[in-house]
Regions:
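Surface-exposed loop/turn elements that mediate protein-protein interactions on large endomembrane-trafficking
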Residues: 1-11, 30-50, 75-95, 115-132, ...
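Repeated scaffold domains used in trafficking and secretory/extracellular systems
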Residues: 7-24, 50-63, 94-107, 134-146
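Short beta-strand elements that form the blades of beta-propeller/WD-repeat-like
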Residues: 17-30, 34-36, 60-75, 101-119, ...
Length: 161
């Protein structure tokens, strides 16, 4: 029983993550960028974005694919690039947030570590940054400017104005 509908060979490339953006589009995160595919029955490669820096983090949702690199800058050691799901660059931003987790959630980019959170919009503009009492386990957007902050000692709902 062969259930393979499509296959591609990429010599010298590692693809650690594949995600479905919707029923018709998917993306493969590569060690040198990402490749976009279209088609629900037989996915076809439509766009490949290559980068010449080492990718340290990735994030995505239905509308954005993000890559983070180290850039060697002492003041702002990370560069974030956000791409639309058609492969066009939406923004590039240098930042210095000491994050351990980055993800896209509800049209925002959420960065956090055990005690700090940062919320950016889909263009990389910071909407909020702060510290919390307790150890952060998870941070999720739940509604219009509402976020769920899961801590080791409980759960908080945060509303940004």
């Amino acid at each position: 029983d062969d259930r393979i509908v499509s296959g591609y060979t990429y010599d010298g490339v590692v693809i650690p993550q594949i995600m479905y953006l919707d029923g018709n589009r998917s993306a493969a995160i590569r060690d040198d960028g990402f490749t976009l595919y279209k088609g629900s029955q037989i996915p076809k490669e439509v766009e490949t974005i290559k980068v010449d820096k080492e990718i340290v983090s990735t994030f995505y949702d239905d509308n954005i694919i993000g890559l983070v690199f180290k850039n060697g800058d002492k003041d702002k050691p990370y560069t974030m690039r956000g791409y639309s799901t058609d492969g066009s660059l939406k923004f590039e931003k240098k930042f210095n947030i000491p994050y351990t987790t980055i993800k896209a959630s509800g049209g925002n980019i959420l960065l956090y570590n055990s005690s700090q959170i940062s919320v950016m919009n889909s263009r990389g503009v910071e909407k909020y940054s702060g510290t919390v009492d307790g150890t952060i386990s998870d941070f999720i957007k739940t509604g219009w400017n509402r976020y769920l902050l899961v801590l080791d000692n409980g759960v908080d709902v945060i509303k940004l104005s």
